[in-house]
């Protein structure tokens, strides 16, 4: 006989996760067996296997030709049963390139499909890089092809770089 019995009422049981894990990593491979995506989360919680799992502080790295090509982070994410990941709150997408070529994209929510390396949002988006800023509402990204299509209310400001300004 057990020395301790845990008594949980039915209302508490409905709210309690059926799955809880710390420091979780998921690797996604192409049909050819090459690494395409690594998704890491500090914690993973799920109440019902048929529902989305909630990931805390997810960190996604996309790979192309064996090298990191994109980084995506947020405060939380929902790993949906259909294979999409919905990143929520302070979503940041950044290219894994040299600093002078790098840009940062920020949005409050983003849907991401790891196998297709495709992302989209209907929310406001801000893209910044040295000397420039672009604001829009909604976008679609094909991360394999490295293309971005902004949907509406697009405005951009770009400051030309002049090497003589550094004197």
Per-region residue spans from a language model:
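Mature-chain termini and adjacent capping regions
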Residues: 1-167
């Amino acid at each position: 006989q057990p020395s301790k019995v845990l008594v949980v009422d039915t209302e508490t049981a409905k709210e309690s996760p059926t799955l809880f894990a710390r420091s979780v990593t998921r690797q996604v491979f192409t049909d050819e067996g090459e690494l395409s995506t690594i998704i890491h989360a500090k914690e993973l919680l799920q109440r019902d296997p048929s529902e989305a799992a909630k990931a805390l502080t997810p960190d996604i790295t996309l790979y192309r030709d064996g090298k990191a090509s994109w980084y995506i982070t947020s405060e939380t994410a929902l790993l949906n049963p259909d294979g999409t990941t919905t990143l929520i709150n302070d979503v940041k997408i950044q290219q894994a390139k040299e600093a002078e070529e790098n840009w940062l994209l920020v949005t409050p929510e983003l849907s991401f499909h790891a196998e297709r390396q495709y992302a989209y949002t209907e929310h406001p988006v801000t893209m910044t890089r040295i000397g420039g800023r672009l604001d829009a509402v909604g976008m679609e990204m094909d991360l394999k092809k490295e293309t971005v299509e902004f949907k509406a209310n697009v405005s951009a400001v770009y400051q030309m770089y002049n090497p003589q300004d550094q004197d």
